[in-house]
Amino acid sequence: MMPLPRGQAIRRDGGLWAFERALARYGLAPVAGVDEAGRGACAGPLVVAACVLPEGRRGQVPDLADSKLLTPTVRERVYEHVVRRALDFRVVAIPAADVDRLGLHVANVVGMRQAVAGLRVRPAYVLTDGFPVPGLGVPGLAMWKGDQVAASVAAASVLAKVTRDRLMCQLGDRYPEYDFASHKGYVTPEHSAALLAHGPCPEHRFSYVNVARAGESSVGCQDGENELVIADTMVRA
């Protein structure tokens, strides 16, 4: 990924729009922000979102922030604002089976590439949260805690998180014994107890140590394939 134009410095405390405004001054607009949800979960999909917000007042989203810093109620409200105001966005869900097959990091990179490639509004620059993503086809910058310092990345984090939470609630209806709606597939005492009691289901990530160990002691639930989450999902209002 390419850095900002030479000699350009941006204060990280300059507000959520500092990076996008600086890039626009160099003709690098529109900007797409990319983030994911579900990296640390041992069940459910890895969800990646790319989002392009309009410049100026049209792109201002009330209460926009890193999705992890928002309550579920506020996050849902911000999600609806982002969907209405975004120039474009794309949400990609990578099923648990593909996370196992590819490995977490590769699955994350693949999801980010798919999300950016699926945008109808082609970005001039891409901001990603955390690590560089090769093969995007446009210049970009990896940002530490990008979802806390760049508006487009924060918007992508909300899209990814809300989409994934909704998918996990659907999986909770399908596999009620795991209570996915409560913990969203992350490791909690309750989730660990359910894994030991019932074994893993097809929506668990078998490459994760705790899931593999639970699978050794129980046959788990085997009713069906990974049907709910598809590998490339367009989510629009």
Regions found by a protein language model. Name each.
Residues M1-A237:
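RNase H-like, Mg2+-dependent phosphodiesterase core
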